[in-house]
């Protein structure tokens, strides 16, 4: 069952400003700087997913995010890493890699971590969120047919999968740290409507296709398609040796007012 993907009931002022951050991957110091910046500047924090895995700080990142969620000061998108870990915890047979094992090994001895993670995912994580029909936030991407399907409420399982995983060519793979990953495809970016800004994470080297997770964009990528629809890729490799970036978004103007690097040679 999917949660209602709107801001209503989330204690959010629709005319306020937001700090939207990329994938954290359990890298606490830059995440804490982002939280502090949002708090000091009265910004609602939006994480576009993948708060956990890879890094060693998953427990404290989840605990801090949960406090923000419970007080209505943050919104959490479900990333593919949250999706995989919660499925494993619930008994599903999923393929686990080294990044996942960092989290699961910690949960074996830290049951509070597991409890708070479950609470975060089951009570608060959403596949996508929209604001004023012009600002959309998800993890991996939006299926080309999503924009029409949303109008009628006929959002399919495939569309929800694309929100978490993006799209890929499974006939072509890249070997990375013991696992094969499909090449990523980006045709969906050209279907974003002209009035929409779409913010995503997931991909630290967008528009290249090759899933080389040791290669990171130096700052968020902004792509504008022919009809004026905008996609912003925020993942810059935090928790993997890269950086954590955030953008300040004004919901009254739909503009990005600032781009901030929260990594300081950690």
Predicted feature residues:
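N-terminal active-site segment of His-dependent metallophosphoesterases
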Residues: 1-64, 74
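Catalytic phosphate/metal-binding cores of nucleic-acid and nucleotide-processing enzymes, i.e., regions
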Residues: 5-13, 20-21, 69, 94-95, ...
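Active-site-proximal beta-strand elements of phosphoester/diester hydrolases
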Residues: 17-25, 135-141, 232-234
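Residue-level marker for buried hydrophobic side chains located in beta-strands
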Residues: 20, 45-47, 76-77, 136, ...
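Divalent metal-coordination and catalytic microenvironments
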Residues: 23, 50, 79-80, 103, ...
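Active-site environment of divalent metal-dependent phosphoester hydrolases
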Residues: 25-29, 53-56, 82-86, 144-145, ...
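Active-site neighborhood of divalent metal-dependent phosphoester bond hydrolases
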Residues: 54-137, 143-144, 149-169
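Binuclear metal-dependent phosphoesterase catalytic core
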Residues: 219-266
């Amino acid at each position: 069952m999917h949660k209602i993907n709107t801001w209503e009931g989330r204690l959010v002022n629709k005319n306020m400003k937001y700090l939207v951050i990329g994938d954290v991957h359990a890298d606490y110091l830059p995440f804490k700087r982002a939280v502090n910046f949002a708090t000091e500047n009265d910004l609602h924090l939006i994480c576009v997913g993948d708060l956990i895995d890879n890094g060693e700080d998953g427990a404290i990142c989840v605990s801090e995010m949960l406090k923000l969620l419970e007080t209505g000061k943050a919104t959490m998108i479900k990333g593919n890493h949250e999706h995989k870990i919660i499925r494993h915890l619930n008994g599903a047979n999923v393929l686990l890699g080294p990044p996942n094992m960092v989290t699961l090994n910690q949960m074996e001895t830290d049951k509070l971590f597991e409890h708070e993670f479950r609470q975060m995912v089951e009570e608060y994580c959403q596949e996508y969120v929209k604001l004023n029909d012009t600002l959309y936030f998800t993890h991996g991407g939006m299926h080309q047919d999503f924009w029409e399907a949303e109008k009628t409420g006929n959002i399919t399982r495939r569309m929800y999968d694309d929100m978490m995983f993006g799209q890929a060519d499974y006939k072509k793979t890249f070997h990375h740290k013991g696992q094969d990953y499909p090449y990523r495809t980006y045709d969906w970016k050209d279907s974003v409507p002209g009035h929409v800004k779409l913010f995503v994470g997931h991909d630290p080297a967008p528009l290249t296709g090759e899933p080389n997770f040791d290669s990171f964009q130096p700052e968020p990528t902004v792509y504008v398609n022919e009809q004026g629809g905008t996609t912003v890729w925020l993942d810059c490799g935090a928790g993997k040796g890269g950086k954590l970036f955030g953008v300040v978004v004004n919901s009254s103007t739909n503009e990005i007012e600032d781009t901030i690097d929260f990594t300081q040679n950690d």
